[in-house]
């Protein structure tokens, strides 16, 4: 059933690439947690090497501004916010250019490079997930002071909470740090992460959140950075990693079912991007892409963050032909397609 829906979506791709439909569900705000897939600039304000607030990042964003989003333009939450009838971009909570009035209709607490496992955030000195929750608590206090208890509580309970996290736990942590490989099997580590995700959902539920979309993992074995390690084997996807992503998604979906059963009044939707992103990767021409093996920025094989800079002479001129912007992150066009799918098939389930 899921695959049929993705294939139907593929056939309509030419019409749906950048047109973001408004979903029938209405939310007063979009509140975002997670990693670089959804970080709109929080890492700009912390001491870490993982930043993207410089050109050519953001070259296709409004006014060509590099905001700290890991893309050439907007990221999925921006398009989702627009599709919900809210703002066309979700502001980062730590950005001093914004205040609580801006955050009342949307706010991002995500930090690029973070993961469910606290050890993942330590690799690049970024915000751990628990810190994102602490900022969310602070936000609630500020919101109540700004709007009053009743209105603020209404926004907190009726908002859509978008959660996208998990890839870094494998690529920056489990497969990079030998001690994790020794301590856990892949299966055990997956359950360890899912337990943390369940605790996180429960934590923000207790703080008043009720409507949440929890994203699964994409086929991260097909990221250009991972393909580069297979350069002498035709730059193939690392199927071992893709199997891990699929298995993780199956386990996470089971946990989502359990949480919906156990937490009274919660509406938790599992948003699985795996099949859609796989279709984009294996049938790029159907979506108007020409290059899926390498990224637009630099050589496209390994550049990310500071290695993806405006002095690199190899950066492509038209990012819309590429699935990936840098070796780890999608282009604005890919983000729009994914957001469109989430709006059409996942968020439409909210009542």
Curated annotation (Swiss-Prot):
InterPro entries referenced in this protein's UniProt entry, alphabetically: GDSL, GDSL_lipolytic_enzyme, SGNH_hydro_sf, SGNH_plant_lipase-like
GO cellular component labels: extracellular region
Active site feature: 36 (nucleophile), 326, 329
Enzyme class of the recorded protein, top EC level: hydrolase
Gene Ontology annotations of biological process type: lipid catabolic process
Enzyme Commission code(s) on record: 3.1.1.-
Localization annotation: Secreted
GO molecular function, one term: hydrolase activity, acting on ester bonds
Signal peptide: 1-25
UniProt keyword list: Glycoprotein, Hydrolase, Lipid degradation, Lipid metabolism, Secreted, Signal
Family: Belongs to the 'GDSL' lipolytic enzyme family.
Name of the featured protein: GDSL esterase/lipase At4g26790
């Amino acid at each position: 059933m899921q695959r049929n829906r993705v294939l139907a979506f593929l056939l309509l791709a030419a019409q749906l690439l950048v047109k973001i439909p408004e979903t029938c569900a209405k939310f007063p705000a979009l509140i975002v947690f997670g990693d670089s897939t959804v970080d709109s600039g929080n890492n700009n304000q912390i001491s870490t090497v993982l930043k993207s607030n410089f050109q050519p990042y953001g070259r296709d964003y409004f006014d060509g501004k590099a905001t700290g989003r890991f893309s050439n333009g907007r990221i999925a939450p921006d398009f989702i916010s627009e599709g919900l009838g809210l703002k066309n971009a979700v502001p980062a909570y730590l950005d001093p250019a914004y205040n609580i009035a801006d955050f009342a209709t949307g706010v991002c607490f995500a930090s690029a490079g973070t993961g469910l496992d606290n050890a993942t955030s330590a690799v690049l000195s970024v915000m751990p997930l628990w810190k994102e929750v602490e900022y969310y608590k602070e936000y609630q206090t500020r919101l109540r002071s700004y709007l009053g208890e009743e209105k603020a509580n209404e926004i907190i309970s009726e908002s859509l909470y978008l959660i996208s996290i998990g890839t870094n736990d494998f690529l920056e942590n489990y497969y990079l740090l030998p001690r994790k490989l020794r301590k856990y099997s892949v299966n055990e580590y997956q359950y360890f992460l899912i337990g943390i995700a369940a605790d996180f959902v429960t934590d923000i539920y207790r703080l008043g959140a009720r409507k949440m979309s929890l994203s699964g993992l994409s086929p991260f074995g097909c990221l250009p950075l991972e393909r580069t390690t297979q350069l002498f084997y035709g730059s193939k996807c690392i199927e071992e990693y893709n199997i891990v992503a699929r298995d993780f998604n199956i386990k996470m979906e089971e946990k989502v079912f359990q949480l919906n059963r156990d937490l009274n009044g919660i509406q938790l939707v599992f948003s699985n991007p795996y099949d859609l992103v796989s279709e984009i990767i294996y049938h790029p021409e159907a979506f108007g892409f020409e290059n899926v093996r390498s990224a637009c920025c630099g050589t496209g094989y390994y550049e990310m963050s500071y290695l993806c800079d405006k002095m690199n002479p190899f950066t492509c001129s038209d990012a819309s032909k590429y699935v990936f912007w840098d070796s780890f992150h999608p282009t604005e066009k890919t983000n729009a397609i994914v957001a469109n799918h989430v709006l059409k098939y996942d968020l439409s389930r909210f009542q």
